[in-house]
Amino acid sequence: MPRTRTPLAAIVLAAGKGTRMKSNKAKVLHEVAGRPLAYYPVKRALELGASPVVVVVGHQAEAVEAALSAALPEAPLRFAVQEQQLGTAHAVLAAKRALRGYRGPVLILSGDTPLLRAETLEAVVSARRRARAAVSLATMTLEAPRGYGRVVRDARGRPARIVEEKDATEAERAVREVNAGLYCVDAELLWKKLAKVGTANAQREFYLTDLVPMAAQAGGVAGVEVPVEEASGVNDRVELSRANRVMVGRLAEAFMRAGVTIEDPARFDCDEGVEIGADAVIEPNVRLRGRTRVGARTRVGAGAVITDGVLADGVTVNPYTVISEAQVAEGAILGPFSRLRPGADIGPEAHVGNFVEVKKSRLGKGAKANHLAYLGDAEIGAGANIGAGTITCNYDGERKNPTRIGEGAFIGSDSILVAPIEIGAGAYVAAGSTLTDPVPAGALALGRARQVTKEGWVAQRQAEKQMKGTATGPASARKGRPAARRAS
């Protein structure tokens, strides 16, 4: 990743409400690949070596600050508040105090551009340095530039000014080169020129673009054309969805080039920050969320959803398994249709089968719960076998209680283990038992009613029913009328 060799600060503009999102949440908090929109331009500036990075917040300022601080806890972030949203120049001025004493270039970028690459930022920064210009700015060429500020160049082909669409003439609106909202400018020049920006425009706002003609007079402006995909901002849900698809596609491509098989990248979904080891196989419609780590040679079946899960090497996750804040050791087999809730710890070569739910429990090496079970607050020893329908009754209405099952124990189908309870190593629990007391190692426990078998009961019952019907007779006979006869 490129890093600038000279001092560099950055300002990320993230104060707007984003009315076109039609949301109660600030626009920059909407997520792409599991991260807030503003996370990406901040992260790219950091990758370039910018320090500090000042984030200008406004609408829902506390929430934006909290989200970025949580996502980038070690980053040299500073926050500046734009109390009123009076335009982009006004927003940049809000960052002045946070950069007090800093001398050097300042990179200015928008908080709603998640697809920018660090290489693109480096191109804008280096263009100013190479051209010895006062300002460098990113531009892009659009087939339909509606809504964007047009870049007007001088006779020598250098950017001379940017005209917002509402202020543009017909000739200027025909220009297809537009402002991408990405600038690099010397800090001293920035504060000096912004003090002169006024509101003589259709929006009655302080435009950052007014800096361009001033810079053209002070040392020139260097223009850098950048890819449309990268510089296009996210303004509504449609654009958010497109940006998410592009970002996930980039992640998928990086995984595949690193040796991961993704069977259908178009039906793959993951968050930024997910890790996948070499020779892992990801089937269609898998979702990998949060800080999930998938080990080498692990196979994740179709429809699985994993959030903050840690899977070791060689794990098999069968289709439609749901994992959340759980860890799985090497060689374990999960699913299909199993669920690991927070605190589940599945040991090496253990099996958690279909419709088995595990919460805050550890299964030792080779332990098996293959069908229809609930295991909560349990410690299950190596090699233990949990039969279908087994339930650990861990909650007594006030607190959670533990269940301990020893190594090699065998729990019969449809058993109910009322916690707190301990089943010793090698013990057997008969099918259908409800247990409340400890079971010693090597013992057999039965906790069910004794079976009673009544031979001939069905025939006796049928005879009794027949006798009852004969004694009562048909309804017509009881009323003194002859019974109706059926034609033969």
From Swiss-Prot:
GO molecular function, one term: glucosamine-1-phosphate N-acetyltransferase activity
EC number: 2.7.7.23, 2.3.1.157
Protein origin, superkingdom: Bacteria
Cellular component per GO, a single term: membrane
Residue ranges with Basic residues bias: 478-488
Region of interest (Linker), ranges: 238-258
UniProt-annotated stretches for the region Pyrophosphorylase: 1-237
Residues holding Mg(2+): D112, N235
This protein's pathway: Nucleotide-sugar biosynthesis; UDP-N-acetyl-alpha-D-glucosamine biosynthesis; N-acetyl-alpha-D-glucosamine 1-phosphate from alpha-D-glucosamine 6-phosphate (route II): step 2/2; Nucleotide-sugar biosynthesis; UDP-N-acetyl-alpha-D-glucosamine biosynthesis; UDP-N-acetyl-alpha-D-glucosamine from N-acetyl-alpha-D-glucosamine 1-phosphate: step 1/1; Bacterial outer membrane biogenesis; LPS lipid A biosynthesis
Record: residues binding UDP-N-acetyl-alpha-D-glucosamine: 13-16, 27, 82, 87-88, 110-112, 149, 164, 179, 235, 341, 359, 374, 385
Span list, region Disordered: 459-488
Cofactor names: Mg(2+)
UniProt-listed GO biological process terms: cell morphogenesis; cell wall organization; lipid A biosynthetic process; peptidoglycan biosynthetic process; regulation of cell shape; UDP-N-acetylglucosamine biosynthetic process
Protein function: Catalyzes the last two sequential reactions in the de novo biosynthetic pathway for UDP-N-acetylglucosamine (UDP-GlcNAc). The C-terminal domain catalyzes the transfer of acetyl group from acetyl coenzyme A to glucosamine-1-phosphate (GlcN-1-P) to produce N-acetylglucosamine-1-phosphate (GlcNAc-1-P), which is converted into UDP-GlcNAc by the transfer of uridine 5-monophosphate (from uridine 5-triphosphate), a reaction catalyzed by the N-terminal domain.
Family: In the N-terminal section; belongs to the N-acetylglucosamine-1-phosphate uridyltransferase family. In the C-terminal section; belongs to the transferase hexapeptide repeat family.
Protein name (record): Bifunctional protein GlmU
